[in-house]
Amino acid sequence: MKINSVKIKMLMLERDLNIGELAKLMKSSRQWVGAILDRGHATLNMVNKIAKALEVEPKEIIKLED
């Protein structure tokens, strides 16, 4: 599913988190989280982990596909 990488990065900035810190909250690797943000795609499971780590609803970080 498509994710809004810009929104995620803005949320990270607001929370003073870098990719490594976000990855730690998600119990994932920094490289994997970085790759997800670069690609702009993630599985539903990863979207849920990102949302939980950023304390937002998953719908706030996904892009609706056309």
Task: Report the location of each language-model feature.
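Short C-terminal boundary/hinge segments that cap the last helix of small helical domains
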Residues: E55-D66
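Recognition helix of helix-turn-helix/homeodomain-like DNA-binding domains
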Residues: S28-A42
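Short, basic-rich loop-to-helix N-cap that marks the start of a DNA-contacting helix
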Residues: R39-K52
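DNA major-groove recognition helix of helix-turn-helix
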Residues: M12, I36-D38, E65
